[in-house]
Design a protein with these regions (language model features):
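Membrane-interface catalytic loops of GT-C/OST-like multi-pass glycosylation enzymes that act
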Residues: 34-39, 135-137, 198-202
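TM-adjacent membrane-interface loops and short helices in multi-pass inner/ER membrane proteins
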Residues: 84-143, 147-157
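Alpha-helical transmembrane segments of multi-pass inner-membrane proteins
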Residues: 1-54, 64-67, 161-171, 177, ...
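Generic recognition of well-ordered alpha-helical segments
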Residues: 4, 70, 82, 112-115, ...
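Loop-to-transmembrane-helix entry motif
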Residues: 55, 147-151, 197
Length: 202
């Protein structure tokens, strides 16, 4: 979705714009049915990145407003149920954020994050080793507990290098195709970076 959005925002022909718009809609349908809440949330930084670096911000704003307005109408029932399920407590172990109770899956994820931060101090430099701690659903927390501060620093450095190089291509290229691809990759990277908070993305 991010890549075809990048192409849509950089192409100059109406025919190609319609093609990329159609592809974006086509890709969005199965994306919604993944029922992945972390992936849905990652759309926000993806769109924000497109707005930040694209020269066609007005078009994006119109599409965002339209999408938000149509979402309650067009979203399938199963997706709405997935969202409402997030805030329904199912046991005494469900966590509360303020006055909002979370479902068991979200609660277990947050509890595991807290345990990671608590146990991290026992092996802060090199961590517990790959698979040495147990399953953790969250890339950054998993990297921190398994590879320690050194592994975390290396991960952030790699992510920074990827983003920097793709941004360089976008800013310096005069070819619309490469600029569109780079813009889409920037947005995709932002989405994956955000997705990594709540899932093992990489």
């Amino acid at each position: 979705i991010s890549v075809v959005s990048g192409f849509f925002l950089t192409t100059k022909t109406q025919k190609m714009k319609l093609l990329y718009m159609g592809l974006a809609v086509f890709f969005t349908i199965p994306f919604i049915y993944t029922l992945s809440r972390t992936s849905w949330i990652a759309v926000i930084p993806m769109v924000m990145t497109l707005m930040l670096f694209s020269y066609r911000k007005t078009v994006l704003i119109y599409f965002v407003i339209l999408a938000v307005a149509l979402m309650p109408i067009l979203a399938p029932k199963i997706a709405k149920e997935r969202i409402s399920y997030t805030f329904q407590p199912h046991s005494s172990k469900s966590l509360k954020v303020g006055n909002i109770a979370l479902d068991p899956s979200s609660s277990a994820r947050i509890i595991s994050w807290k345990e990671c931060l608590s146990d991290f101090v026992n092996h802060p430099i090199l961590g517990y080793g790959i698979t040495g701690y147990g399953f953790v659903d969250g890339q950054y927390f998993r990297t921190l507990i398994e590879l320690g501060l050194i592994g975390m620093a290396v991960l952030f450095y790699l992510l920074f290098i990827i983003f920097r190089e793709v941004l360089s291509v976008y800013r310096n290229s005069t070819n619309d195709y490469y600029r569109g691809l780079a813009l889409g990759m920037l947005a995709g990277c932002s989405a994956m970076f955000a997705h990594s908070i709540g899932a093992n993305t990489f």
